[in-house]
Design a protein with these regions (language model features):
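Phosphate/nucleotide-binding beta-alpha loop and adjacent structural elements of enzyme active sites
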Residues: 2-208
Length: 208
């Protein structure tokens, strides 16, 4: 970690760690953010990733990780579900807005639909990605909307009180395979991001 921080600071032109910078990096580490992937990138890529860091919206810098793995690829294709607002905490906003990527966002929570449409230009699907297509499932929209989830998975992140207070409604499901066919996704995806508050395994279980 020290080596990585020193490389980052070198790109920023620092030879001594400022207290504010040290506090920022320490806070990132305390929240589980891993910068280990930066140890493997070239100096030129590192400089670009450092420049992009303030633009990153992803909670754990997943967008920067993807760029580092794909050589700062432009024009890639992503699939992300649950997309929420499409910007805050988004793993793909940076890829679309600054690297010309296209893709598919899936988000069944009604509270996000208006903001998602305003924030993104890619394909947006409001069905709930699940292991099968055409089912009607109960959905919980919590007071903290980032934690919205399918009924039956609320125990993952919601307290009993928060679950009881959640707005409930039915959502229509689509399998991952059918979602890709529906929107004519390419045969090879550059990045698949899944954040569904507990139902990830069910989504991928029958995906071939």
């Amino acid at each position: 970690m020290k080596h990585i921080i020193n490389r980052i600071l070198g790109q920023l032109g620092y030879s001594v760690i400022r207290n504010s910078k040290l506090a920022s990096l320490s806070a990132a580490a305390a929240h589980g953010r891993s910068w280990d992937f930066l140890a493997e990138v070239t100096s030129a890529q590192l400089a670009e990733l450092v420049r992009l860091n303030p633009l990153s919206q992803a909670q754990l810098k997943q967008d920067l990780f993807v760029l580092s793995e794909l050589g700062l690829k432009r024009g890639g294709f992503f699939v992300e579900f649950g997309a929420a607002s499409g910007k805050e905490l988004s793993n793909t906003w940076l890829l679309e807005k600054h690297f010309g990527w296209s893709g598919i966002l899936a988000e069944p929570a009604r509270c996000w639909h208006e903001r998602l449409a305003a924030n993104r230009s890619c394909i947006i699907d409001h069905d709930c990605v699940w292991r099968s297509t055409g089912a009607q499932l109960g959905f919980l929209e919590a007071a903290q909307p980032e934690l919205a989830t399918l009924d039956g998975f609320q125990h993952v992140n919601l307290s009993e009180k928060a679950s009881a207070a959640a707005v409930r409604y039915q959502v229509k499901t689509v399998s991952l395979a059918d979602l890709l066919v529906r929107h004519h996704a390419p045969a090879e995806l550059d990045y698949l991001s899944i954040d569904t508050e507990g139902s990830e395994y069910e989504i991928l279980r029958d995906f071939d």
